Amino acid sequence: MNIKQLVRKNIQELQPYQSARTIGGKGDIWLNANECPTFNRLKLENIFLNRYPECQPRELLLRYSSYIGLDKKNILITRGSDEAIELLIKTFCEPQCDRIVFCPPTYDMYNVSANIMGVECLQIPLLNHSWQLDLKVIKKCINNFKLIYLCNPNNPTGSLINFRDVLALLKMTYGKSLVIIDEAYIEFSPMNSLVNLISQYSNLVVLRTLSKAFSLAGLRCGFVLANFSVIKFLLKVINPYPISTPTSSIAIQFLSNINISKMQDRVFSLILNRCWLINELKLISNCIDHIFYSASNYVLVRFRNSNKVFHELSNQGIIVRDQSKKINLKNCIRISIGTSQECLKVIHAIRKIDCLYVN
């Protein structure tokens, strides 16, 4: 039997998302997935798994509500922000009819999730090197899409969207489409969060996660923050038991005041490491073409020969993320910010590579 003939045509042609773990690599310094390199201790006690969990665990909603400064009715808990990305398309887009917009170079799951759902994607690239929205092109297409996904800070560029541009976008799309801001990395630039605009704009949706600054990438816990008119429809579509009891218990622990304080200390430490790494990279001139500004826990670097650098780093046990196939990112590599020791090893390794250009 030919199983392929039973598969939806768009799935047959689908290019799946290539996660850091899927790509893999040989080494002991993993700087390819923007994970937090350190972790808090946790306790799992008196957890009973014979009962189904709450669809939206009340205590977790209250904890996150307190952390974010938003009413719990404006919060939906999901299995990481990846589920939220897909859930919004599933809820608001008609397959083979509606469109979404995303602005590359950016996170690939916006495109992949739409393709899985049979929803057309319209790519409007960020303005080259400034990495800002091309509002003129977006305005021309304003009646042709239901959702627009923006990542802020953007992955993989590390850039921030101009606040005035976001306001202009919210106004021009009002009553026509939803503006979805993915704030997976916002704890590294908290002053740039758009959560405070949710009460003013019913077409604004903000996505959050515990995977990055909270160092819980393995937990899979994220949040949709939006007007209740959006949340109530997402509740119709989300699976009945999306958040396991252990997931909820751990997330609640990490949202305690003491663990939020530890998270903020960890973020401060990573920002110091990022500044040090960037300053050291600026002293390496032969193999590096450009170092991009970053407001996140990674830095994007354009090398003169990214393929050579990528493989040399891999040979030295350092796994980074090749971005050179993405639009406007020729010869670019994204380096996650690790511990101070890991950053030091990265610099030593790139200095060795730099010497090859001299000799």
UniProtKB/Swiss-Prot annotation:
Record-level GO BP terms: L-histidine biosynthetic process
Keyword field contains ATP-binding: no
CDD domains listed in its UniProt record: AAT_like (cd00609)
Pathway: Amino-acid biosynthesis; L-histidine biosynthesis; L-histidine from 5-phospho-alpha-D-ribose 1-diphosphate: step 7/9
Molecular function GO terms recorded: histidinol-phosphate transaminase activity; pyridoxal phosphate binding
Keyword Transferase: yes
Gene3D superfamilies: Aspartate Aminotransferase, domain 1, Type I PLP-dependent aspartate aminotransferase-like (Major domain)
Protein name: Histidinol-phosphate aminotransferase
